[in-house]
Amino acid sequence: WDALHAFRMRLLRLSPAAFIHFGTTRELRALMTEDVKQYAFLDWKRCVLGRASERYALNNAVVEHGCEIGADCYLEDSYVLEQSRVGAGAVLSHVTVRDREVPADVALHGLRLCDGRFVVRVYGAGDNPKEATFLGEPLARLGEWPSLWEAEIYPVCGTLEQAVDAALNLYALARGEGDRAAWETAERTSLRASFNAADTRFILDWEASLRETAQAEALLE
């Protein structure tokens, strides 16, 4: 009471409304690609601010003609350009994918760090950051860390597109392929450290700029 008595409080009842909880990438993907139908009464749609499709869901994303997007993907705040191909069930967030192939059932999440550099975090849609697994395999193949959250496996790069390539190389390494020497010599960060070092002002500006592009594209369709 000592802390709150000076403030007025008001109860607002929103209608129509629904409480929606999701805590994992897999749950987010399911919500946006399938469960969204249950919230039609809230005017929710699979595609908002972007080219509509019955195959995938998006929110504030630009997908150029010529790109192939697999079934049940979720794209947010991203550009998919040129001849890119995105595998089924992939989740893209805050990335630019230009003429690249994104594997199925992975998440690519881009961040600009406060020092102006970029990192793209790649992981399996079903991965649990609290566990020592990566893309469904033991994390020990890459190094000794207690969990994916703490694992310093994500290269820090000068540009976002370089960071996308580094993330795809990391995916290849987990599959026994890729350029391990390039990964080992790169400065790397973790999910935890990159989260704490994210440039939030840049993220908001990125989303606003992309929103303008998506709106302009919609007018030209």
What are the functions of these language-model segments?
Residues W1-E221:
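Left-handed beta-helix
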